[in-house]
Amino acid sequence: MENIMTLPKIKHVRAWFIGGATAEKGAGGGDYHDQGGNHWIDDHIATPMSKYRDYEQSRQSFGINVLGTLIVEVEAENGQTGFAVSTAGEMGCFIVEKHLNRFIEGKCVSDIKLIHDQMLGATMYYSGSGGLVMNTISCVDLALWDLFGKVVGLPVYKLLGGAVRDEIQFYATGARPDLAKEMGFIGGKMPTHWGPHDGDAGIRKDAAMVADMREKCGPDFWLMLDCWMSQDVNYATKLAHACAPFNLKWIEECLPPQQYEGYRELKRNAPAGMMVTSGEHHGTLQSFRTLAETGIDIMQPDVGWCGGLTTLVEIAALAKSRGQLVVPHGSSVYSHHAVITFTNTPFSEFLMTSPDCSTLRPQFDPILLDEPVPVNGRIHKSVLDKPGFGVELNRDCHLKRPYSH
């Protein structure tokens, strides 16, 4: 009889943060909104707060970057560690160190589903259907997968059953789809800059932006719009039809997450051939089931916000059973290892984090070391062939650990 590998137990869990409201300057990292000045990601992008003129020009003006980056590290009895990052900052540190630690320490490194279910159940009364608590749980879950992969010496995608394709092809999200085309991406997704409070003039301005990019990019390059929860059904429908002559591939997250009936109506009234997508700010498997039932074409969970890799795998299976695509919100290595195993994820998102979109920069820079970026718009599976998620923690980022246990 062959010997079965004996796996160690988890000895410690620790939580740090960088950036956020108490930082002197933008720190980047897991909270990619936490950037310095003159960055496209903070330049008059339409949001639910745009109707208030004081908060229209900058998303940082209403506090989009106050949380900062949460870093969770789990250490096994043998000294090996796994870690992950997300958006939850100092408050996430409190949740990990003062509540979730009891479900982690003492468990076997392979007990990921058990820990996940206990974290969900224990926080249900104060987590709702997403947000800060779910971000924190997601970060712990990802750290556990990283540790498990490092202990057994396998990349996470092989723990999930292996790749179903040789490479991942990407579209780029940023202000310059024309530059994304030059870099080899298959498409470019732009933020909208106007909303219902701007009336028909706002629709004309965003449609003109799409028309301009269509002229620059040619007829076949994908163009998409990210509306970031800033619209209502009427406005979104009118904008979709205004952009239809320019072959807009999809219109994304037009409505707040809870407006399921609105998404159903938008899908029903959208131009033929134009896809309706959403899911970035949804958390929990149950919310994605409701979203799937609206009939949208692509669900876009963020693996760092929806419940982690454990939940993302469940969402992908749910979508597959309904013939829907899952294209996760850009999450770098944490989504790369998942999507290369999903048959219903034919492409993925890469978020441009350089200020003017002119260069490729790792999404979670500077907190991750050895974080890969696409080459000619693609990442080959061989790039992912390192234990765990294949990245290391940059401990020179002035990590702060505000709590302990």
From Swiss-Prot:
Site (Increases basicity of active site His): residue numbering on this chain: D302
Any GO MF annotation of the entry: L-rhamnonate dehydratase activity
Domain of life from the UniProt record: Bacteria
SMART domains according to UniProt: MR_MLE
Site positions per UniProt: Transition state stabilizer: E349
Co-factor requirement: Mg(2+)
Free-text function comment from the UniProt entry: Catalyzes the dehydration of L-rhamnonate to 2-keto-3-deoxy-L-rhamnonate (KDR).
Residues of the active site: H329 (proton acceptor)
Protein name as it appears in the record: L-rhamnonate dehydratase
GO biological process, one term: carbohydrate catabolic process
Class of this enzyme: lyase
EC number(s) on file: 4.2.1.90
HAMAP family: Rhamnon_dehydrat
Originating organism: Salmonella paratyphi B (strain ATCC BAA-1250 / SPB7)
Name of the gene encoding the protein in the UniProt record: rhmD
